[in-house]
Swiss-Prot record:
InterPro entries according to UniProt: DNA-dir_RNA_pol_bsu_external_1, DNA-dir_RNA_pol_su2, DNA-dir_RNAP_su2_dom, DNA-dir_RNAP_su2_hyb_sf, RNA_pol_bsu_bac, RNA_pol_bsu_CS, RNA_pol_bsu_protrusion, RNA_pol_Rpb2_2
Polar residues compositional bias, start-end: 1167-1180
Location of the region described as Disordered in the Swiss-Prot/TrEMBL record: 1154-1180
Protein name: DNA-directed RNA polymerase subunit beta
Gene: rpoB
Family indicated by similarity: Belongs to the RNA polymerase beta chain family.
EC annotation from Swiss-Prot or TrEMBL: 2.7.7.6
Single biological process term from Gene Ontology: DNA-templated transcription
Gene Ontology molecular function, alphabetical: DNA binding; DNA-directed RNA polymerase activity; ribonucleoside binding
Source superkingdom: Bacteria
Keywords: DNA-directed RNA polymerase, Nucleotidyltransferase, Transcription, Transferase
Organism the protein comes from: Halalkalibacterium halodurans (strain ATCC BAA-125 / DSM 18197 / FERM 7344 / JCM 9153 / C-125) (Bacillus halodurans)
Amino acid sequence: MTGQLIQYGRHRQRRSYARINEVLELPNLIEIQTASYQWFLDEGLREMFQDISPIQDFTGNLVLEFIDYSLGEPKYPVDESKERDVTYAAPLRVKVRLINKETGEVKEQEVFMGDFPLMTDTGTFIINGAERVIVSQLVRSPSVYYSEKIDKNGKKGYTATVIPNRGAWLELETDAKDIVYVRIDRTRKIPVTVLLRALGFGSDQEIIDLLGEDEYLRNTLEKDNTDSAEKALLEIYERLRPGEPPTVENAKSLLDSRFFDPKRYDLANVGRYKVNKKLHIKNRLFNQRLAETLIDPETGEVIAEEGSIIDRRTLDRILPYLENNVGFRTVRMSGGVVEEDEVRLQSVKIYAPDDQDGEHVIRVIGNGLVEKEIKHITPADIIASINYFFNLLHSVGGTDDIDHLGNRRLRSVGELLQNQFRIGLSRMERVVRERMSIQDPNSITPQALINIRPVIASIKEFFGSSQLSQFMDQTNPLAELTHKRRLSALGPGGLTRERAGFEVRDVHYSHYGRMCPIETPEGPNIGLINSLSTYAKVNEFGFMETPYRRVDPETGKVTAQIDYLTADEEDNYVVAQANMKLAEDGSFIDENIIARFRGENIVVSRDRVDYMDVSPKQVVSAATSCIPFLENDDSNRALMGANMQRQAVPLLVPEAPIVGTGMEHVSAKDSGAAIVSKHRGIVERVTAKEIWVRRLEEVDGKEIKGDLDKYRLQKFIRSNQGTSYNQRPIVKEGDVVEKREILADGPSMEKGEMALGRNVLVGFMTWEGYNYEDAIILSERLVKDDVYTSIHIEEYESEARDTKLGPEEITRDIPNVGEDALRNLDERGIIRVGAEVKDGDILVGKVTPKGVTELTAEERLLHAIFGEKAREVRDTSLRAPHGGDGIVLDVKIFNREDGDELPPGVNQLVRVYIVQKRKIHEGDKMAGRHGNKGVISRILPEEDMPYLPDGTPIDIMLNPLGVPSRMNIGQVLELHLGMAARRLGLHVASPVFDGASEEDVWATLEEAGMARDGKTILYDGRTGEPFDNRVSVGIMYMIKLAHMVDDKLHARSTGPYSLVTQQPLGGKAQFGGQRFGEMEVWALEAYGAAYTLQEILTVKSDDVVGRVKTYEAIVKGENVPEPGVPESFKVLIKELQSLGMDVKMLSSTEEEIEMKELDDEDEQASDKLNLNIDSTESNV
């Protein structure tokens, strides 16, 4: 027997074919959401209040300080928030202190700052009753970027950009004449020396002393027309503010506010970290030849000789000195923007590598590690970045790849919320300042100063309408999990679909272990929306990290030490794959190892390996790692497989796959659809609706019983996508459960494992051409036994509002409706629970007053006294739409009088839930896990299906031609292994990239007593004759997708028309018609089908009178009359007349036809037909 038995949860054992032992447990898969939000509550909010505090008025007399904040208890729990359509939020209270410096008076107050949306335990938010997810955003990290450019003459140049988190960009570039220019905030370019002068290096000599002798610098100085700090400041001011009179003071304050004011310019923690990393001298001396001897200024000791080359060892040795005090110098500045008159830099002279003689000395200037707390750019940063640019021109340093994950970072929920909160607070700050100067300083209170509206508005706007706040995909637990782990490059501050090029979307070597190379949507968003890999984490700076096992450099053995590396850090190491053979003691067995280094696959000797992968599945995402035999599938098909699993509809009877990957249990547990125990305990009570667990706590080495936890189960709730959300207990009374153990299955789960589809008997064979083009033939057994039956719940609501003519009323008393239509309504006029409804049936009876005139005072009085039903009402009842038949599951009624929160003008709201049981049907879409999708073309009687030698009819026939060209061979291996496992009564796990090999599959087939090739003779169910060749038959896991024919089928005879053009609307939602477009008209013209053409352009479209006459003629059995003039023709004439053109219509005898005559004809016809043209089913 190959493989070993592994327990997944309490109820499932699988035979696993994995050869590599798991050294690291999978992290909590929704940690990216929960940890980020927790950071926001603990630190993010505090940072914001510290940034804004204190707020002073313009005189400096009043000071408002934010001291502390606290979150209260939410008004409603999660379930009730959903039911009541409110936001699940807690009140945020802030302690504020107001100091009056004149009188010395101090006032403290607690101010309510609005309700703040809370994250549920499962990583979602409930906004206005709907469950939403905040998707993490992939953006370019703030930093200094250097890139190469080739101009139109083929000359190589460079550009540099300093990108902050917010604030002005600073760009450097070279031109054809080897002059270095700078652009401030995308304005016109100026020589870089102008900026240096403005910083306080007025003369040419000072600039040369600062940066060293250089031909590029000489060229730039020649181009520069300024010769002092003042002139340079004026020059920059003219570029930034053209047309304004320049003064030195204005120029100083402008530049100061652009770059050196923390409120206007922010690099953020990550920007400061990246800038220091890029510009610090230690990272730039590697492999360079020193042109001076480095001496420790404190001891006088020689650290490195002139002429020595700094290799990795030397660099490690001199690193402590470089970080401490070697090479530092202080440079004086005068008359510049910055108030300080000196700047501290670190510089070392080296020989330029591009010089043939090797004698050209250049300077490497570092920014001297600016403190982490300084979030704006400093003169040292500007000088060091300019120096790096000059060094690049001499081949020192390197350019950056902006698609490398070291230069792209994630903004998760916490940070996105913080940015939004900052916008609200800064708007509030402005209001506070204004109020301080208007109101009387002695009687003022903090409460009166603070206006919380802008804060609440910005938070509401973010959750309600941001591109990154999305309606959660709740089709099944996997869709839920994937949505929470999604990474989007779109959104505010990100890319746009139209502008994103090929490079950004492409797979990059730094994605390894951080972002899934497979799971991404097909279509315009490909590569812009990605998924986090299974083991990846996000560090404090927002960079994705992936775990590796450390290799001990002394012994060469793989240790148990796990290090999480960012893409930048990984570039310094040689990493071995997870499938390298190891001895018992952790040393590599093979002499030469296949490893990765900076995107190259290389063969190295084993002593050069620094790290080793943790697991083969660390490359892919949660959804992709649920595909068995992924290694045998083409990546394009694997992409479809991963995406289609997210569209699987939860079935009536879920069944976990016989051939799984071992990820089913973890995905199900972390998705948020299952109920997971919060503590270790003993189960005391289990019902369909709740589970009680008594905590077991350890005190002095003994276990004692603690508090009781009550877990409520969701029963047949409507999910966001209209599928049924139902939880079922899987523990019994008396069970001892561990912390984070599954207590109840959610939708699409069985025994604690993800169960998206069913294991069915599949044969690869054709049958009468019915599986042409990937179509699927099913056995009727799957319909009869409810194998692919799913439950769908639709919600309909009707509200009774106040209208100008009086309030609407929900009632059973509806005009012109027979008793038969009301048979299922209760006395209030609302359908009873359990009633069967067909489309068009009344769900909620409602009447709306349609008074033509306002009532006089006397009539109103009579109406009030006698309650006469004299007033005219019309029927506006809620009816079941087309395709909406089913059984009433639940009815919810909300009344303003009962204290329910309803929108303004609404007195009563009724929600009706209708449940449908949908069996599998021709036209439904099905798929396997390998991207093998198809539409059901025929459902055959069981007796006509081909059958096995033992008489078992097969369930599904797939076209064998769907396999070779698509190159998803994984499905064939799954088929064979599934059959063997079913025979052996096993469930198996074949983890991705470490699953069952071909040999394992054949061995398992033999173990099950089957033929080694997995094929069998099949007999035709109609004749009983055997088919000519043996056929591959086995168990495959097939899922039913959310694209069901019931949702797509649509037909219209008459229906609503557009108001202006009077043409039928389009689309199923509007009950529209099929568009007969320009090309279809050409087809009829080509055939010369004149009458058909005329009819389609008039009575079937927008000839208002004509279509009514035609309808009448058809009803009476008369001939169809002549068509009239289409409405769109009249609209066209009116449009041309509105342009001032005189448009006339001529008859065939060239007499003018007046539009008025046509209108009169219409009116006469309408009078005769007794119809009101204006309201002919004209719904917009």
